[in-house]
């Protein structure tokens, strides 16, 4: 619901940093992230710029992080989120009050800024521009899977709005000390700020290097991109423009979502054509990896989504969840292992490898439950598997949080044969619910799974390597004491955001201090 009254006083000054005590942070599941002991004078105002947030609209891990990290950071810094006004946002149960207006630039239309206050205190700024964002579908395309042809306009408008807010052009009585932009849709935020000579520091986080927001050079006039940006050191990318590269080129610092992935993307195998550029950033000390966390709602003992909550050692409770998952997917009753796939159905996720080992899993006494949506050809392949192995493999095309949580709780193993995985969240969710990942030894999977302790890793993106890891999983399943010991270790793994937040908080403080120092010398 959008308030029809324009609040000419803008945002509320009493909500600025330093004017209220640092609270504990409510998160889903009636859990609380306890404050870390840090001095309040270091508290900064931070604007998160993102194309999705799990509370309102989500297509993947970016939405989860955009919802969890600002909340986990709330006791350290005043973090607010800027997101486009999609229908899912405008028609949520949370009221929106118009607090400011922004003029247009080049082909980017004028828009309004709305403020949404979430029940737990998170402030979300909504970029209201009906001609760009009020469309049925995902944040990036129509329901038929095709990207919107004007995405370059839609997300350039998002980046420019962030720059405008940082320059206080929106006059909302809140101005960030730092702008934290996420993935290619927010890539032009650091760029516009740099081109204008704004001194506010910027941080750009790469969640997935493969999605680069590449558009034609002919888009420059529409977006107001200066000619000097069309260089290898700028946002030029093999004769085109890359929103992702713009974020990397002009941000004060770059992070990605795991230490291993930060190393991998500086190599040709994982660099997506940007390995040399990123290697240079690493050498300059401008690229680092900070792992994601997961919120404390991922607790099998208290999760309201589960029909039978259970705790470490309560394996009868886990078995009850397994029986429910088998019923959900039309699988036969079985005492064998249940494997889960909870994933976007895209090439990156290695689903063709799972398709190739499916017969081995079934012949060895296992079953597979698959949930997800994505590329049409991948969806068709998964449906074909279910038809080929009725009662042994079940597929649901689509996604909802409740079913996903129940699958993590009911499965014995999670299949994640990703060709690359910047961080990955599913493997952490699964471990919290006692489901052991069978995963490729890459990116965040390598950083969050202890091979033979909390899961099973394999090195090569081949059927043989994958099948060897599955063989180890079947052997462990045959020894309940060993299986349960691994489950205990997995469920106790420390993946909460409290641990992940500290490096971000320190980086924020360093970037702001550096920017202030540079300004003082000029």
Swiss-Prot record:
Record: residues binding ADP-alpha-D-glucose: 58
Domain of life: Bacteria
Keywords linked to the UniProt accession: Glycogen biosynthesis, Glycosyltransferase, Transferase
EC number, as in UniProt: 2.4.1.21
InterPro entries in the record: Glyco_trans_1, GS/SS, Starch_synth_cat_dom
Region (Disordered): 1-29
Pathway field: Glycan biosynthesis; glycogen biosynthesis
Catalytic activity: [(1->4)-alpha-D-glucosyl](n) + ADP-alpha-D-glucose = [(1->4)-alpha-D-glucosyl](n+1) + ADP + H(+)
Function summary: Synthesizes alpha-1,4-glucan chains using ADP-glucose.
Family that this chain belongs to: Belongs to the glycosyltransferase 1 family. Bacterial/plant glycogen synthase subfamily.
Protein name: Glycogen synthase
Protein's organism: Pseudomonas fluorescens (strain ATCC BAA-477 / NRRL B-23932 / Pf-5)
Gene name in the database record: glgA
